[in-house]
Amino acid sequence: MGSDSTLSLPSSSPPCNNRSSVPPTFTTRIFSDVAGDIIVVVDGESFLLHKFPLVARSGKMRKMVRDLKDSSSMIELRDFPGGPSTFELTMKFCYGINFDITAFNVVSLRCAAGYLEMTEDYKEQNLIFRAENYLDQIVFRSFHESVLVLCSCETQEIAETYEIPDRCVEAIAMNACRKQLVSGLSEELKGRDCLEMWTEELSALGIDYYVQVVSAMARLSVRSESIVASLVHYAKTSLKGIIDRNCQEQRKIVEAMVNLLPNDEKGSYSLSIIPLGFLFGMLKVGTIIDIEISCRLELERRIGHQLETASLDDLLIPSVQNEDSMYDVDTVHRILTFFLERIEEEDDECGYDSDSTGQHSSLLKVGRIMDAYLVEIAPDPYLSLHKFTAIIETLPEHSRIVDDGIYRAIDMYLKAHPLLTEEERKKLCNFIDCKKLSQEASNHVAQNDRLPVQMVVRVLYTEQLRLKKALSGDSEEGSWVLPSGVQSRAVSPRDTYAALRRENRELKLEISRMRVRVSELEKEHNLMKHEMMEKSGNNGGTFLTSLSKGIGRIATFGGETRQKVNRKSRSVSERKSSRSGR
């Protein structure tokens, strides 16, 4: 076609009631002395034209003119591709008036030419030939032009008849693959090619065509980094300003994004090129708009396979179901399960002789994250005990070096749920390994009234054993453990003696604390006994007798320990005197 700009021509008024959008040049440029002899109506808009230019290039117009009755000079074209504006361009072509074929009108022109049967059978280099030539020579050789044409196909369903969308999709994928090969030779171009061109260009497509394009790219082995960058940008653009729970289009977009996520060569989900924040964002949006269960599980599985890189904010997924709890604990529990499955699979693949340092490091990181998560959700008064303990039970014991975090979470849960039974409190406290508590946490336990008495006694007993072990020097590999949990080694007899003196003082201080605690328990016991006697008379005698024996054992335990410590202190003093005598 010519290179002139598209003409904007005034309309004329033919001698009929219908308005004509065809300018006088249509009737005077070629046939200056012949008036228009046919009226074509397109979507209610009339065009006064000449039969000869139309029938010379259009098979459909030739048939319709031939079928006209002698008294009629009007033809009506229904559902014309592109409407009156596109019909005007086709008439300009028939009259030999130059205009530009562009990426914005080529689809309409190609569909209109097919509708009017403007083939080579009627005229050489007819409109179908010109439109197809533009597609082949200009559009399909350019990534940008192909995207523009594919966008215009969304409003032209008839374009599917001529396979324009399919050809655009293949052209986009081929151009992307070609540019990848070029950019692969230059590290400078590689990042810009992946993160700028595709992310910006493809975000203009509707979700149906976008899915086809990305699928074609994956089939042609376009870099996964480029595909992921495009997915992230497309999701941010198309899901902006959400969220409507009943929006089918948004649900369709999220589900399509999930299905397009790439896997590595082994089909694994642990591709680090997929940002974890993007996966969590899709999961949170998907939870709100209620995407399919299979898509939710896919997102949870992918998140679980790189859970060690997550943050606390990522895990705080609001609950949108008909529940009273603030957070979606069930989803986090499933994510944690997927993470542990990954660790187990890696252990099975590596075997017993392999170095499992990486897996253990990941497990420790997740342990810290989950402890922080438990602390965050524990104050929720509507959080059920079952869901709270499910998170704790799922993590193995070796996922924590210290249990201070889990103790803090349990303590906060007890504070927010004062109506728990004694058995439920005991069940919670059984998750705490007293040997893994720091000195600070152990001191807090000793003064914590929310904990069962058995828990307090267990912690105090563990602390005593730890101190006794430190004083006796009986520890593995010649080392001993301080109450703070820090391991040390004896450097010289003087250092050992000084350390023993410090430990002796700490032991005496701990015993003093124990006495205070036992005294408080005895006061509580007397108060309970008094109240029970008033309410139940002699019926509560058996229970009180049992409780008295229990507290008596606590006092006895403290007394025996005190005697042993005094004997140990005297032993230390004797060794000191012996050294001085030497």
Curated annotation (Swiss-Prot):
Pathway(s): Protein modification; protein ubiquitination
Domain NPH3: from-to ranges: 196-466
Domain BTB: residue ranges: 36-103
InterPro entries: BTB/POZ_dom, NPH3/RPT2-like, NPH3_dom, SKP1/BTB/POZ_sf
Keywords carried by this UniProt record: Phosphoprotein, Ubl conjugation pathway
Domain of life of the native organism: Eukaryota
Keyword Phosphoprotein in annotation: yes
Modified residues (Phosphotyrosine): Y407
Compositionally skewed regions (Basic and acidic residues) per UniProt: 571-582
Chain segments carrying region Disordered: 1-21, 558-582
GO biological process: protein ubiquitination
One Pfam family it belongs to: BTB
Function: May act as a substrate-specific adapter of an E3 ubiquitin-protein ligase complex (CUL3-RBX1-BTB) which mediates the ubiquitination and subsequent proteasomal degradation of target proteins.
UniProt similarity note: Belongs to the NPH3 family.
Record comment regarding domains: The BTB/POZ domain mediates the interaction with some component of ubiquitin ligase complexes.
Name of this chain's protein: Putative BTB/POZ domain-containing protein At3g08660
Organism from which the protein derives: Arabidopsis thaliana (Mouse-ear cress)
